[in-house]
């Protein structure tokens, strides 16, 4: 039984590292390597083995947000670059469904991250309003998808 729990925890930590490496590989600040890049592996392992992850290693319900957070960030970057919002909708709705409290915190982080990214860009007002509208629309869709599960729990 204990070995199974440890294997399950190792799989979850590995998934957190995998999603972080997926985000970092697509990030514009990290150069795409021709082979295996050690920076990608080091930062993915550092994210997966962070103090938060290790502190809650035996409480599996908190780990879903750690796994999905890089995908939510990548989804926000996709929304900003007009690549679509399917990844953002799927990752955010799964995060909210898997754990309401941490999902709520990820939603707050998403707003702060999006605002920080948009403030850092110098774009015309029309494009700014379009990006904000798309972010709000995709966030509401993710909230509506997760509401199918969360609303009956509250009432």
Language-model regions: role of each:
Residues 1-155:
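Membrane-embedded transmembrane-helix bundle of lipid-linked glycan/lipid transferases
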């Amino acid at each position: 039984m204990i070995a199974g729990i440890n294997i399950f925890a190792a799989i979850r930590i590995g998934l957190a590292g995998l999603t972080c490496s997926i985000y970092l590989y697509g990030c514009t600040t990290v150069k795409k390597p021709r082979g295996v890049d050690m920076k990608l592996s080091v930062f993915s392992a550092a994210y997966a083995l962070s103090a938060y992850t290790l502190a809650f290693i035996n409480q599996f319900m908190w780990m879903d947000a750690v796994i999905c957070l890089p995908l939510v960030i990548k989804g926000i970057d996709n929304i900003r670059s007009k690549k679509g919002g399917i990844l953002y909708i799927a990752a955010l709705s799964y995060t909210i469904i898997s754990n309401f409290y941490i999902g709520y915190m990820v939603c707050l982080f998403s707003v702060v991250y999006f605002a920080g990214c948009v403030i850092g860009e110098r774009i015309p007002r029309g494009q700014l309003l379009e990006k904000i509208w798309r972010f709000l629309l995709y966030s509401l869709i993710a909230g509506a998808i997760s509401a199918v599960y969360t609303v009956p729990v509250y009432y």
